[in-house]
């Protein structure tokens, strides 16, 4: 009798993998189009679209073209966008960030008028709005915290006035969530939510995004306010503080390299958890696919599903359109 004849295997996991139908029936996690948010870059001008050179397939849009893009996104079933603006001018005081006729404020009004059902989230940070490329105001090479928070309050309120459904502070200044919540409530915008970039790491995966937004730091790096990639418990502290201060949704950023942080956040806190599939992660897939080294569609869908499996309720991704088409 051969060795194989002697096997007495009661539990054979492969039974449940034998056919596609069986695999689908026992699948534990499912990605849907409702999970996706599309980051949208808006620039000055009219009737123009520019491809971001370091992010093939990702574009900057003038407001009129952004409106058309949002109509297409909503038709695909995508429920939300996150708006990022490229201002016509940058100032040291960041005042363009809260200009009622600024790039983001105009975009919010136009998109909300054209696609009122779409959830509009807006980035709240100063890096595109000052010449320094940092998320806060700068004095003598130092990124100021409390002074920055005052500007962020004005920025968030201006977005709410324009029609934003959620503001998304990505700046990582201490105390900004509580301050923004207070400012929104005091200006009769208690229905406007806050999606906090709660655990945002000082990552090397952000390079192409800064290219897209023309917002690379002009000196130093962001390690004095963004988190050390080596730290886990610090992330839990940041998340807890933001929840206590009034965050409705918390985010972990970047994505794939920080799935352990997503899982810990979801296990520890009873709030919706978002994840950002960031520009560097997107660009790496694009580059490898262009070389023919990987199947882009399969890697895209696997990456997004893994984020869902780790505990993400919401996934910000530049692949939202492509994924939505696959999921239809």
Swiss-Prot record:
Keywords tagged on the record: Heme biosynthesis, Lyase, Magnesium, Metal-binding, Porphyrin biosynthesis
UniProt-recorded Gene Ontology molecular function terms: porphobilinogen synthase activity; zinc ion binding
Keyword hit for Transferase: no
Pathway of action: Porphyrin-containing compound metabolism; protoporphyrin-IX biosynthesis; coproporphyrinogen-III from 5-aminolevulinate: step 1/4
Active site: 200 (schiff-base intermediate with substrate), 253 (schiff-base intermediate with substrate)
Name of the molecule in the record: Delta-aminolevulinic acid dehydratase
Residues binding 5-aminolevulinate 2: 279, 318
Function description: Catalyzes an early step in the biosynthesis of tetrapyrroles. Binds two molecules of 5-aminolevulinate per subunit, each at a distinct site, and catalyzes their condensation to form porphobilinogen.
Top-tier EC class: lyase
Binding residues annotated for Mg(2+), in chain numbering: 238
Catalytic function, reaction form: 2 5-aminolevulinate = porphobilinogen + 2 H2O + H(+)
Family: Belongs to the ALAD family.
Subunit structure and binding partners: Homooctamer.
EC number: 4.2.1.24
Record's GO cellular component terms: cytosol
Reported regulation of activity: Stimulated by magnesium, inhibited by zinc.
InterPro entries, A to Z: ALAD, ALAD_AS, Aldolase_TIM
């Amino acid at each position: 009798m051969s060795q194989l004849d002697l096997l007495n295997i009661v539990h054979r996991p492969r039974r449940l993998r034998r056919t596609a139908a069986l695999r689908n029936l026992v699948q534990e996690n499912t990605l849907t189009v409702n999970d996706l948010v599309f980051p949208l870059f808006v620039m000055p001008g009219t009737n123009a679209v520019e491809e971001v050179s370091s992010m093939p397939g990702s574009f900057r849009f003038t407001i009129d073209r952004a409106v058309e893009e949002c109509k297409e996104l909503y038709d695909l079933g995508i429920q939300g966008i996150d708006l990022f603006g490229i201002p016509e001018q940058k100032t040291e005081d960041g005042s363009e960030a809260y200009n009622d006729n600024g790039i983001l404020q105009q975009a919010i009004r136009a998109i909300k008028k054209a696609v009122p059902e779409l959830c509009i989230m807006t980035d709240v940070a100063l890096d595109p709005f000052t010449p320094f490329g940092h998320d806060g105001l700068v004095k003598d090479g130092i990124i100021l915290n409390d002074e920055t928070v005052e500007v962020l309050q004005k920025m968030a309120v201006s977005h709410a006035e324009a029609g934003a459904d959620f503001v998304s502070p990505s700046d990582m200044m201490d105390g900004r969530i509580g301050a923004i919540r207070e400012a929104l409530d005091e200006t009769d915008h208690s229905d406007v939510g806050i999606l906090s970039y709660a655990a945002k790491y000082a990552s090397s995966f952000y390079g192409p995004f800064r290219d897209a937004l023309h917002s690379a730091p002009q000196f130093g790096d962001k390690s004095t306010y963004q988190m050390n990639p080596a730290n886990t418990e610090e992330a839990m502290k940041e998340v807890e503080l933001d929840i206590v201060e009034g965050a409705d949704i918390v985010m972990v950023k970047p994505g794939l390299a920080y799935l352990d942080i997503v899982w810990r956040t979801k296990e520890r806190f009873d709030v919706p958890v978002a994840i950002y599939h960031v520009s560097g992660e997107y660009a790496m897939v694009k580059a490898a696919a262009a070389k023919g080294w990987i199947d882009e569609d399969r890697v895209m869908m696997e990456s997004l599903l893994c984020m869902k499996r780790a505990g993400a309720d919401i996934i910000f991704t530049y692949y939202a359109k492509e994924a939505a088409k696959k999921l239809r």
